[in-house]
Amino acid sequence: MKTDTTLPIIAEDGDCGDSKRVRVADSGYTVGGQDRPVKLPKIENNGDVGTSEGTHVLVDALMAEVAIKDKDGKTNAGHGVVSVMGRQRAMTTAVSTVVDEIPSYDIFGIFDGLRLAKFFEDRLRRLVKEEVKACHGRGVAADWNKVMKSCFSEAVGTVGTTTSAVVTIVGKEEVIVLCRGGARVVLYSHDGVALPLCHIHHHKDGVEQILKIHKRKKIDDFIVLACDGLWDVVSDDDTYQLVKRCLYGKLPPDGCISESSSTKAAVILAELAIARGSKENINVIVIDLKSSTVS
């Protein structure tokens, strides 16, 4: 007898920024009675990733059909989020987004645990709103170093943890990264140039958080924020080729993934990581700077 269970696969592509759980088949049987074939986009001159028209990557029940829409039935092309437990026994990481709530800024993050994610989401929402409002009144630039120190110090004092957290704040003119290990942020520009804004490092007591500010340019295409479950097995170049094809090219119709190009990109990256044997939780956030809500 088939029984459904809710596994920690979270896909998001709504304007409201809320995460939604999707129902997936239990690992004891396959989706729809068989392994779901995932056809990856063909990438020229890249034999590692490229697939022929008849090639499929089988990703059984670990990845399920994803067709998520927001409350108004619209999809958001600005960002896509996917979290997969993968081959781990538990989901130890969590993602958080704050979209369309703060004038000119959206917030995306990957954290060690749901409690830390929720804390940062609430605290950053308040701190960024306050800083943006104060700076607008004074006509000066935001003090992101103050925001970062306030948030991390409150996290240690309130949540009682020094674990990893990586936050990307996307504004109209800048991208701000607050990093305390655990995930990697890469900004991709025209012709596949990859600019790492944050490297993965295992946080230890005494290691300071890192602040990076990148002034946005017209050649900036998209950002991928992901944990080592992706980066351990998928290269920067493979990531660029796949996401570029999803956002700006054409994918074969699959009937499973939502209309959001950003969500398609995040899902395919997660599926590729699983197909390549990733052993960690996989969290992927794809931010399309060309169609971002704050662009």
Curated annotation (Swiss-Prot):
**EC class:** hydrolase
- Organism source for this protein? Arabidopsis thaliana
* Protein's name according to its UniProt entry: Probable protein phosphatase 2C 54
Family assignment? Answer: Belongs to the PP2C family.
- Which Gene Ontology BP annotations are present? positive regulation of seed dormancy process; seed dormancy process
The record ties this protein, via SUPFAM superfamilies, to: PP2C-like (SSF81606)
> Mind naming one GO cellular-component term on file for this protein?
nucleus
Show where the PPM-type phosphatase domain sits: 78-289
Under Enzyme Commission nomenclature, its number is 3.1.3.16
